[in-house]
């Protein structure tokens, strides 16, 4: 759970600027909901109808992230961009052709979001659809880690829920491949010590005297 929490926090941090740009709303905020672990079948039941789902693979068919959002909420964001109030019919379960381009832009932002949060460029959308069970490669009894992020544009009365689900194998892959950047030595350069960034930093200095008996004949 700790590893997934860390990953989700990175997603939330990266989501704000990306979604703010997508929605043309600098005041947009992103909040992270509670984290849960449940069988994939239970998660699918919670998604309900009228969703837009995308599976973002991690270079392998069964490893990746399932990202879901409501068609109605997606259309509401698009309507706000056009200057509307963001109010849509409750039975808006099918993506209108006018919002198809916006949906593709959303998918591109999610792919970028996953890449940045995981530092894995392999993340890419491999399947999309209105029915999650048709594109999700997890078995119904597979455990998945889930979280809901809520994006709320400035001035909006309601938020936009974006749901993430990852299987344990995907999480293990992300954790196992996490690269630890080695320390990189940098030379001071032609400016010398006084002209370097540490030239005027006071550093503690300690000298240790060591008694080393040595014959005078050995000293040149």
Model regions and ranges:
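N-terminal auxiliary interaction/assembly segments of multi-subunit proteins
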Residues: 1-220
